[in-house]
Amino acid sequence: MSVMFDPDTAIYPFPPKPTPLSIDEKAYYREKIKRLLKERNAVMVAHYYTDPEIQQLAEETGGCISDSLEMARFGAKHPASTLLVAGVRFMGETAKILSPEKTILMPTLQVECSLDLGCPVEEFNAFCDAHPDRTVVVYANTSAAVKARADWVVTSSIAVELIDHLDSLGEKIIWAPDKHLGRYVQKQTGGDILCWQGACIVHDEFKTQALTRLQEEYPDAAILVHPESPQAIVDMADAVGSTSQLIAAAKALPHQRLIVATDRGIFYKMQQAVPDKELLEAPTAGEGATCRSCAHCPWMAMNGLQAIAEALEQEGSNHEVHVDERLRERALVPLNRMLDFAATLRG
């Protein structure tokens, strides 16, 4: 019998915070990046959780700001020969898997994800080997090696629909790596799901008691929650969904005040969508406690202007994403299944 890797006992040392830039330095790097993007026939693909100034730059240069599913779609279809991925490492790997002919650059290759780190491929392979009768579904927040072992890759925006589909076929599921999202999907679908026990270091920190106090302070506010959050937080939500779904919910809900339980990087695009509404961060620190992530992924914060400029300017392995070709071919199969399934949902 396999022994599951225990993410709760793993230590994820946070990267050092980037050195703040002056106003003049920011202006210098912004202009430099714009010039280099044109010179390299490159386009920026940025996640909602990157810092606002990075998202703004992606907008201004014709790039993409989105969740991981749309990032994958956009990068594969865009004619640029180089993709600058502002996000975390698995997003760069996914871009390379889908677009092997393109040069994939990242501000740094040290941008990790606690869900990815919490699902080592050797332990995960052993876990799957112990349950050969189950269909393996892995979240996009995993390494190329873990994706290569999977039958399906999925993002939070289509997780419920996919598991509902597989359940209708009578399939039993291994779900990895996020235990909270897995529990949410199981509750929504009633599927037979065996969960890996990983968690996002941002969403796992949201605290029920502190959120209750904030709700009491603002009783007219709606609560928006990402399903990577603990079940008790999800149970308090007026809307639950992926990043793009939460932005849509912010627009659809009649409330003028919204408490948002996800990475605060989302506030940039959410505030654009609802400029007249007040957005409040859900608390990540309990009574007498301090937060580690404080509602912002420390690795997402590594996607700074200076690092992006260096990635575009410097050639070499410090910034370019590579995926072994045999591994890429194996990981491409479940990724294409995800994209094909998502296309059927869009009609």
From Swiss-Prot:
Q: In which pathway does it act?
A: Cofactor biosynthesis; NAD(+) biosynthesis; quinolinate from iminoaspartate: step 1/1
Which EC class is this protein assigned? transferase
Q: What's its catalytic activity?
A: iminosuccinate + dihydroxyacetone phosphate = quinolinate + phosphate + 2 H2O + H(+)
> In the Enzyme Commission scheme, what number(s) does this protein have?
2.5.1.72
Q: Coiled coil: which residue ranges?
A: none
Residue sites binding [4Fe-4S] cluster per the record: C113, C200, C297
One Pfam match, by short name? NadA
Q: Where in the cell is it found?
A: Cytoplasm
Predominant location: cytoplasm
Question: What InterPro entries does the database record attribute to this sequence?
Answer: NadA (IPR003473), NadA_sf (IPR036094), Quinolinate_synth_A_type1 (IPR023513)
Q: Which GO terms describe its cellular component?
A: cytosol
**Signal sequence, renumbered to the chain:** none
Binding-site residues, iminosuccinate:
H47, S68, Y139, A140, N141, S156, H226, P227, E228, T243
GO BP, sorted A to Z: 'de novo' NAD biosynthetic process from L-aspartate
Q: What cofactor is this protein dependent on?
A: [4Fe-4S] cluster
NCBIfam families assigned = nadA, PRK09375.1-1, PRK09375.1-2
The record's comment on protein family reads:
Belongs to the quinolinate synthase family. Type 1 subfamily.
This chain's function reads: Catalyzes the condensation of iminoaspartate with dihydroxyacetone phosphate to form quinolinate.
| Listed name of the protein | Quinolinate synthase
Which organism's genome codes for this protein?
Shigella flexneri serotype 5b (strain 8401)
**Lineage, opening ranks:** Bacteria, Pseudomonadati, Pseudomonadota, Gammaproteobacteria, Enterobacterales
Q: Which gene encodes it?
A: nadA
